Design a protein with these regions (language model features):
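Conserved mixed alpha/beta core segments that line enzyme active sites in large multi-domain catalysts
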Residues: 1-6, 302-364, 478, 483-517, ...
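A short beta-strand motif that forms part of the nucleic acid-binding face
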Residues: 122, 357, 365-368, 528-530
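N-terminal non-catalytic structural scaffold regions of very large proteins
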Residues: 1-323, 368-483, 521
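A short macromolecule-binding patch
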Residues: 531-536
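Short acidic, glycine-rich loop/turn motifs
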Residues: 20, 97-98, 130, 354-357, ...
Length: 536
């Protein structure tokens, strides 16, 4: 997650955070002097160390290993003909020595005076780095007290454990415990996928701990942000938010229950003599700890609700509801306007209309008509593929992140029988903005105007002529409608009614087409011609 904050003096400070599903948070932030510091504890902000120190500890121990990832180390041929322009932005990679006397310090700009001294000493070449693009990391390298892996590990340990004697072995064990132990640190498959996608690195999806390459790539991206390159993360964008399904929430509860069971088993094993005959797993393992947690999850969880079955629509809508509340989520009292507001990335994924009117407004939403959730928990919406200005019948589902780079035409743009656009200029979306473009630039097209809204909002006739506030009330009040004594179809419908009733599974569906021949409170008989077979 890449962010920026504004200091009291008005300076913009860029930062990034790596937030695992389980384990220690890691934050890197620039200070007002353009030095990048690592924070491993959000509460104790004083315990910080330079980003270069942390990189040395993560597997870039030597100066060359570290610097070569950020700057180009080159050999400079020394001559008296050099001028200030040719030396601009060049810095010695190492201290230049004359015996025990330092001629030029590393990472200090080269001057004509230094070049003359080197010519007098008879030195032909010198290793330099080119800092023309930026000098941001050079500042950290100058101030870094550590120059190898061991000193970096000791410096980190000294900051994190002030009272303990700093040794490289202790520091290595501490870092392993914090970031490299799968039992205590887990990015999950989603975390690994997002890191690979954002930083454009290719690390195996099964690698669920942090690796040195992750931190190095994140640091490079942060330096790019400082120079005006790259994009900051929008916390309300659906590319940064995912749906945690029931299975995932239950798995987390089971992990807690199994941890308690493990502790109880270990306690019993210390009390019993291991050599006693007749020791069985049944005597050691008490499943009550696990079953109590699972029962508590389904019985008392904030998200465990009694299903609304006033009518078929109420049931269907309740099953398709998304909540930002609950354990690990937001608090309705502290949630601000931004998190409740409609975002451009909600298009085709979260309905902008259907939401409660009370304090939960914007925190509880409904999925759009054609939206689905992918394996990582991100909401996808379908689009028709456009090839060479022709709309095809191929459907592709895209997440909010994936559709960022594409031009997407609206579903109501007129097309001919072969799929070609009839208008010379068509309305399309690009990064949430509506623009008029040439059909040749379009990549995808919406599948239907209905994909923008949820099932409840899609059941409102002439929705486009409705005021948004009235549509919100209408979509909520449809769920409160009770059945008629004599069922009757409405004069005006939208075509979604049958699909909503059928998919809610609250109506009886015949296995084959036919006409009702007989019915009672207990059975319904359908036959091809609507006549009961005559028994012999």
């Amino acid at each position: 997650c890449f962010e920026k904050s504004v200091h009291l003096n008005g300076k913009i400070l860029h930062s990034f955070r790596i937030i695992p599903d389980r384990g220690s948070w890691l934050e890197v932030q620039f200070d007002t002097n353009d030095l990048a510091y690592v924070y491993l504890d959000r509460r104790r902000r004083r315990r910080k160390f330079l980003v270069t120190t942390f990189l040395r500890a993560l597997g870039y121990p030597t100066e060359r290993d570290l610097v070569s990832n950020f700057y180009n180390i080159q050999k400079l041929k020394i001559s008296e003909k050099m001028n200030e322009e040719s030396l601009a932005s060049l810095m010695p990679f190492e201290d230049i020595m004359d015996g025990e006397v330092v001629v030029a310090r590393s990472y200090e700009p080269l001057s004509i005076g230094v070049i003359r001294q080197l010519v007098a000493l008879g030195q032909k070449t010198v290793e330099v780095i080119d800092s023309s693009e930026d000098e941001i990391l050079v500042k950290s390298l100058k101030k870094d007290p550590a120059h190898d892996e061991e000193s970096a590990l000791k410096d980190i340990y000294r900051k994190l454990r002030p009272g303990d004697p700093p040794t490289a072995a202790n520091a290595r064990a501490l870092l392993k415990r914090l970031f490299f132990d799968p039992k205590k640190y887990d990015l999950t498959r989603v975390g690994r996928y997002k890191i690979n996608q954002k930083l454009k690195i290719d690390i195996d999806s099964n690698e669920r701990i942090m690796v040195g390459e992750d931190f190095l790539a994140a640091t490079k991206y942060l330096l790019g942000l400082k120079k005006g390159e790259g994009i900051l993360d929008d916390i309300d964008h659906l590319g940064s938010r995912r749906v945690r399904a029931v299975g995932e929430l239950l798995a987390n509860q089971c992990r807690v229950g199994l941890a308690r069971t493990e502790r109880l088993v270990k306690e019993r094993m210390t009390l019993f003599d291991v050599n006693i005959e007749g020791m069985t797993p049944q005597k050691l393992i008490n499943p009550k700890a696990l079953s109590a947690v699972v029962r508590d999850f389904f019985g008392r969880s904030q998200l465990s609700q009694f299903m609304d079955q006033t009518n078929p629509l109420a049931e269907l809508t309740h099953k398709r509801r998304l909540s930002a509340l609950g354990p690990g989520g937001l608090n309705r009292d502290r949630a601000g306007f931004e998190v409740r507001d409609v975002h451009t990335s909600h298009y085709g994924r979260i309905c902008p209309i259907e939401t409660p009117e009370g304090p939960n407004i914007g925190l509880i939403n409904s999925m759009c008509t054609y939206a689905r959730i992918n394996e990582f928990g991100f909401i996808e919406t379908p689009y028709r593929v456009v090839k060479k200005s022709k709309v095809t019948n191929t459907i592709e589902y895209l997440t909010a992140d994936q559709e960022e780079g594409y031009l997407i035409a609206q579903a109501n743009n007129p097309i001919d029988k072969k799929g070609g656009f009839l208008n010379e200029r068509i309305t399309a979306r690009e990064r949430g903005e509506f623009i008029e473009v040439d059909p040749s630039r379009v990549d995808y097209m919406d599948v239907s105007p209905k994909q923008l809204v949820s099932v409840a909002a899609g059941l409102i006739p002439f929705l486009e002529h409705d005021d948004a506030n009235r549509a919100l009330m209408g979509s909520n009040m449809q769920r409160q409608g009770v059945p008629l004594l004599r069922s009757d179809s409405p004069y005006i419908g939208t075509g979604l009614e049958e699909k909503a009733a059928r998919d809610s599974r609250s109506v009886i569906v015949s296995e084959a087409d036919g006409i009702v021949a007989a019915s009672s409170a207990e059975y319904i008989i359908t036959t091809k011609d609507g006549k009961l077979p005559v028994s012999e």
